[in-house]
A protein has these predicted regions:
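Hydrophobic transmembrane alpha-helices of multi-pass small-molecule transporters
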Residues: 1-73, 79, 175-314, 409, ...
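Membrane-embedded alpha-helical segments and adjacent helix-loop junctions characteristic
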Residues: 47-134, 289-364
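Membrane-core helix-loop-helix motifs of multi-pass transport proteins
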Residues: 125-221, 365, 369, 374, ...
Length: 439
C-alpha cells in the first residue's frame, strides 16, 4: 500500500504543479497503477479499469458542453441579461441581478461558460457608467461557482457525485423524504446575495440599458430546457433486470445529453447547409476535462484496490471520532480550505470513496447513510473555490477577461468580495444541510 500511496501523492502533486498537462499526468498515473496490477503488486486488470470508467458521466458532460455552446451562439444569454438590466433602478441592483442570472444559468450550465455568457454585459454596463468592471465580474464569477452544486447538471463535481452515488437529477431537489442540496445552495445564495447588496451599497448611479441583442435561434434554449426535463423524467425510469436494456439504462443521462446535443448540431448544419456547425460544436468540447475524468476513474480505482481509500477513511474516522457532526464539520472545513487553492475536480473524485468508507465506519462500525457527508463535501469543495482568485476555473476566466480588457486585478480586490460571499454561503448552506439531514 505504501508504494500505491506514494505514487498517488506524486501524481496528484504533479497535477497541481503542471496544470496545463493535468489530463496527461492523470493518464500516466492510471497507466502506472495498471502496470502495478500487471506485475501482481495487487489485483487490478485492464477489465477492472474499463469497468471503473463511468461512461454515463463522460457522455453527459460532453453532451452538455455541446448544447451549451449552441445556447451561447444563439445569443439568448445576452438577451436575457439585457432584458433584466433594463428594469432595474441603479448599479447596485444591476450587479445583484447579473449575479442572480449567472447563478441561475450556472445551475444548469458549466460555470466557465456562464461567465463567458454574462461577463460581456457586466463589462458594457461598467463602461457606460465609467465604473471599474473588476468587482462586477468578480461578483458574476463567484455567483456562478456557488450555484454549480445546485443540480446534477450544474458542475463537473455534481456530475461526479451523481455518478458515484447513483443519484439522479431529482435527488438533488428531494431525496429520501428530505430536501436535497439544491435548497441549501439556494439558501446560501440568498445569504451571499445580501452580502453583494451590502458591498455595492454606494453604487446607486441610475442604469439605462436598451435591449439590442437579437436572438438568432430559439431552438438551443428549447434543447437546454428539454435536456433538464428529460433528465428529470429519466430519474423515474424503472431499472431493467439485465441485457442491452440495462446497459442503456446505466447510460440514460449521457444518452439524453449527447442525443440532444447531436440533434442541435445536426439542425444547425441543416440550416446553414454546411458541416461547419457540427465541427464547431465538437471543437467546443473540453477534451482536457473529459480525458482528466477518464484517467481519474482508472487512477482512483487502482488506489482503491491497493487499500489506500480504506486507510484514508480510517484516518478521517480517527480524527472525527464516531460523532456525525464532527465528521460533517471536518469535511466541510477541509473542503473549503483545500478547494481555495487546488482544483476541486480531482479533489472531489478522490474524496467521494473516502467519504463512503468513513460513513461505513460510523455508528460503531454498523455504518450510517453517507448522503449528508456527500452533500457536505460538495458544498465545501464548490464554495471554497470562491475564497481565492485561483480557486475555481470561473474565477480564472473572469480575471482573464478583465486583463484582456486592460484591467488590473489585485488579490485584495477579489478577497474583498470572495471572502464574505463564501463565509455567508458556507455558513447558511452547510448549516441548513445539517438541519435537513443531520438532526
Amino acid at each position: 500500500m505504501t508504494l500505491a500511496l506514494s505514487l498517488f501523492v506524486l501524481f496528484y502533486i504533479l497535477m497541481l504543479a503542471v496544470q496545463q498537462y493535468r489530463p496527461w499526468v492523470a493518464l500516466g498515473g492510471a497507466g502506472a497503477f495498471l502496470l502495478l496490477g500487471k506485475l501482481g503488486v495487487y489485483d487490478f486488470t485492464l477489465a477492472d479499469a474499463a469497468r471503473a470508467v463511468d461512461f454515463n458521466v463522460l457522455l453527459m458532460m460532453a453532451g452538455m458542453m455541446g448544447t451549451v455552446f449552441l445556447f451561447i451562439q444563439s445569443k439568448m444569454p445576452a438577451r436575457l441579461a439585457e432584458e433584466l438590466i433594463a428594469h432595474v433602478p441603479n448599479v447596485r441592483w444591476a450587479v445583484s441581478v447579473l449575479a442572480l442570472l449567472a447563478g441561475f444559468i450556472s445551475a444548469f450550465v458549466d460555470n466557465v461558460a456562464t461567465v463567458l455568457m454574462v461577463a460581456p454585459v457586466g463589462l458594457a454596463i461598467a463602461r457606460r457608467l465609467k465604473l471599474s468592471p473588476v468587482p462586477v465580474l468578480i461578483a458574476i464569477a463567484v455567483s456562478s461557482n456557488l450555484q454549480g452544486a445546485a443540480t446534477l447538471a450544474g458542475d463537473t463535481t455534481s456530475i461526479l457525485l451523481g455518478g458515484f452515488a447513483g443519484m439522479n437529477f431529482f435527488d438533488f431537489f428531494w431525496m429520501e423524504g428530505r430536501p436535497g442540496i439544491f435548497w441549501s445552495v439556494e439558501l446560501g445564495a440568498l445569504a451571499s446575495l445580501g452580502v453583494l447588496f451590502w458591498l455595492f451599497r454606494d453604487q446607486r448611479q441610475p442604469v439605462h440599458v436598451t435591449v439590442e441583442t437579437e436572438v438568432e435561434d430559439d431552438v438551443p434554449t428549447a434543447l437546454l430546457l428539454l435536456t433538464v426535463g428529460l433528465l428529470i423524467a429519466a430519474s423515474f425510469l424503472p431499472e431493467p433486470s439485465g441485457g442491452v436494456l440495462h446497459l442503456l439504462y446505466t447510460l440514460r443521462s449521457g444518452l439524453v445529453c449527447m442525443g440532444l446535443c447531436l440533434f442541435g448540431a445536426a439542425r444547425a448544419c441543416w440550416r446553414s447547409r454546411s458541416l461547419k456547425p457540427l465541427a464547431e460544436t465538437f471543437r467546443a468540447l473540453d477534451y482536457d476535462t473529459l480525458l482528466l475524468l477518464f484517467s481519474l476513474f482508472i487512477l482512483l480505482e487502482g488506489v482503491s484496490r491497493a487499500g489506500v481509500i480504506d486507510a484514508a477513511a480510517q484516518l478521517f474516522h480517527s480524527a472525527a471520532g464516531d460523532e456525525p457532526l464532527h465528521l460533517y464539520l471536518l469535511l466541510v472545513a477541509a473542503s473549503v480550505g483545500l478547494s481555495a487553492f487546488i482544483d476541486n475536480i480531482p479533489y472531489v473524485a478522490a474524496m467521494l470513496p473516502v467519504v463512503q468508507g468513513v460513513a461505513a465506519l460510523m455508528n460503531g462500525g454498523a455504518g450510517i447513510e453517507p448522503e449528508l457527508f456527500y452533500f457536505g463535501l460538495l458544498t465545501g469543495a464548490t464554495l471554497g473555490g470562491n475564497l481565492t482568485p485561483i480557486g475555481a476555473s470561473a474565477n480564472i476566466a473572469a480575471i482573464g477577461i478583465l486583463r484582456k480588457n486592460g484591467e488590473t486585478v489585485r488579490t485584495r480586490d477579489f478577497l474583498r468580495i470572495g471572502v464574505p460571499f463564501t463565509l455567508a454561503a458556507v455558513l447558511v448552506g452547510a448549516g441548513s444541510l445539517w438541519l435537513f439531514w443531520g438532526i
